């Protein structure tokens, strides 16, 4: 993708509301296919280690990481990591709001986007923070791949809205 398109997405991301107007988000953009491939392999290796140590994963994830040909990033050309530059009670929520803005803008720009949650543990290791120049104290909160979709899949069915409580003041 052209840098102008990435800048459009990032500018949309930073328009998201933040608690106390702290604006904690910072971004890492990866468009190097070799780095993406190596990172994908490390993620699969780390998930396999977790499985051996007793941390169970869903059967679907187990099948994916056991497949040598599976690329965690689905061979997308661009990965954007949304990071918090510092930590407080609301920074994670702030970064997720930025992630949603980024994804909505990507969709409006005819791009496909997908959150890759499997990557978070690995990109937050010292090894990958060093490779990606993520400073000490910063934390990757979300990970989004972007690409040009071959097709637009139908919307997934959603569960009905579940309202736990609704209290209102009845005006007479």
Please report, for each region that a protein language model flagged, where it lies by residue.
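Short, surface-exposed beta-edge/turn micro-motifs
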Residues: 24-25, 76-79, 140-141
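Small-aliphatic-rich amphipathic alpha-helix that forms the alpha element of a beta-alpha
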Residues: 13, 80, 85-130
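A glycine-rich helix N-cap at a beta->alpha junction
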Residues: 47-53, 59, 131-156
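N-terminal amphipathic, basic helical "cap/leader" segment at the start of enzyme domains
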Residues: 1-73, 171-172
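Arginine/glycine-rich "motif VI" loop of SF2 helicases in the C-terminal RecA-like domain
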Residues: 19, 106-108, 136-137
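C-terminal helix-cap and adjacent tail motif
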Residues: 66-67, 140-172
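Extracellular/periplasmic catalytic domains that process cell-envelope and extracellular macromolecules
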Residues: 72-75, 135
């Amino acid at each position: 993708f052209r840098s102008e398109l990435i800048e459009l997405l990032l500018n949309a991301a930073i328009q998201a509301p933040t608690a106390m107007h702290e604006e904690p988000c910072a971004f890492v953009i990866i468009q190097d296919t070799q780095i993406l491939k190596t990172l994908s392999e490390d993620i699969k290796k780390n998930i396999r280690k977790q499985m051996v140590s007793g941390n169970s994963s869903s059967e679907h994830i187990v099948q994916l990481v056991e497949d040598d040909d599976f690329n965690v990033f689905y061979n997308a050309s661009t990965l954007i990591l949304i990071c918090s530059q510092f930590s407080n009670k609301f920074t994670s929520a702030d970064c997720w709001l930025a992630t949603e803005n980024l994804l909505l803008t990507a969709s409006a720009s005819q791009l496909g986007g997908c959150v890759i949650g499997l990557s978070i543990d690995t990109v937050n290791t010292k090894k990958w923070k060093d490779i990606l120049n993520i400073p000490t104290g910063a934390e990757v909160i979300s990970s989004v791949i972007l690409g040009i979709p071959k097709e637009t899949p139908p919307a997934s069915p959603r569960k009905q809205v579940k309202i736990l409580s609704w209290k209102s003041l009845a005006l007479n």
